[in-house]
Amino acid sequence: LCLSKVNDEVNHDYIMGLSTFFEKRNWNLFVYATCTDLFWNTPEDRGESAVFSLINYDITDAVIILDEKIKSTVIIDSIVRKCSEKNTPVIFAGGMPKGHYSLEFDYEEGFAEVIRHVIDDHGVTDLHMIAGIKGNDFSESRIAVFKKVLSEKGIEFSDNMVSYGDFWSVPTETAVNKLIDEDRLPEAFICANDTMAVTVCGVLADNNVRVPEDIIVTGFDGVEAIKFSVPKITSCLCSYDDMARETAALLDKLFGGDMTDSRVLITPRLLPSESCGCHCTEPINTSLYLNEVNNRYYRFQEESFALNKIAARIQMCLNIEEVAQKFNRAQYFYNMVCVLTPECIDESIDPAKHCEKKYAEDKLYQLFNTDVDNAYKPRAFDRNEIFPQIKWVMDKKIPLIFFAINFMDNPMGYVCFHFN
C-alpha cells in the first residue's frame, strides 16, 4: 500500500480495515508512506519519496495506491511503471486511471440519496445548495447531481438556488448571511460537505432560525465533527472500512482469475440524523470520546518532548554506536526498527554524494530494533530481507509501515513500524 499521512483518520481507517480483512486471508500488508502528500516537490518531498524504492516487486502480489493522498503524478507514474515491468497488478483506491483496477466512491449516487431523502421523506421542495469552489470538479459534479435530482422530482432549477461556500466556513457564513439579508432562506440547505453544513447550522442559530424545525440542513462525507454538532448533521458516509472490504474482495477475484470488471463503485451510506428531523442512529458517548482526544493530545506533547530530547543527545554522540545506545534508553520507542544505508555507517563517506542510489546496496545496517534484546548496535543484514527478523513479524500478520529517513533530498535509511 502506497500513501501519505498514515496518521490521517481516513488513512488510518483504511489501513486498519485492510489489516483486518488481509489477516483473515493469511495475507501480509506492507505500507510505504510519506509524511507529506509530495505536492510541492521540495527537496524534503524528494527525500521522503525514496521510501517507494524499497518495494521489492519480485515478492509483491499487488500494489495498492491511495492516489488521492499522493499528489505527485511523477511518483505515481514511477510506481506504476515498475509494476508494469514486473507484471504486478496495480489497484487505485479512490481514482480511475485507464488500464488499471480501481475502487471509487460513487459520490454522485451518495449525494443524490441525501437530496432524495429530503424531498421524498420530508416533503421539501424549496431547496438551496451550498456548493464548494466554483469550477472545482467535486463541486461542479455535486451541482450537476442537484440539478438532476430536482429534474427527477419535477422541481424547476434556477441559478439562484446555488451559493458557493468554497468547502469551508468563512465563505459559507458570507453566503448564508447574504440569503438572510435578502430574505431568501429556503426550506432546506443541501451542502456539498459537512464542514459547510455545520457552519450553516451555526449561522442560522445566530439568527434565531431553528434546525430542523424551520430549515433542514444536510452535509456530505460523514466526518467525525457531525456527531458533535448541534443538531447532529444528516450526511452520507464515505466509509474507508467499506473501501478496505471491497479492496480485499477485488484481490480475491484478481488472484482467483475471476476478475471481470476493472472498476468497483462503492456507494456511500446515508446517515439520517437530527438536522433533517430524523433521529440520530449512531449515538456517541461524548465523555469517552473527549477522554480519548485528551489522551492523544497529552501523548503528542510527551512524545514531542522525548523526540526533542533524544535529538539533542544524538548531537553529542561521537560515533554511530553511541547513537544506537541513546535509543536504547529512550522509553518512547517501541515496535520499530531503524535501518541505515552503508554511507551513514562508514564515517569516511559523505552520504550526500551517494543519495542517488536509494537503498540499492546489497547490505543495510540495523541501527536499533526495539523488540530484540541487545539490538542497539549497528548490524548488517541482507537488503532483500528489508526487515531483520522479518519472518517473525510476518507470521503475526501485522502490517509493516515504512518511512524514509532523509535529510533534504538525501535518503539515509528508513524506519519500519509494526504495531500490534
For the regions a language model picked out, list residue spans one by one.
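PAS/Per-ARNT-Sim sensory domains
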Residues: P171-T174, D382-I386
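Short beta-strand-to-loop transition segments that serve as allosteric relay/switch motifs
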Residues: M408, G413-N420
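Bacterial carbohydrate/catabolite-sensing allosteric modules
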Residues: L1-K309, R313-C317
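A short, aliphatic-rich beta-strand micro-motif
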Residues: P388-N406
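Allosteric regulatory "coupling" segments in signal-transduction proteins
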Residues: D346-F381, P388-I390
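Helix-loop-beta substructure at the N-terminus of cytosolic sensory domains
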Residues: M316-K353
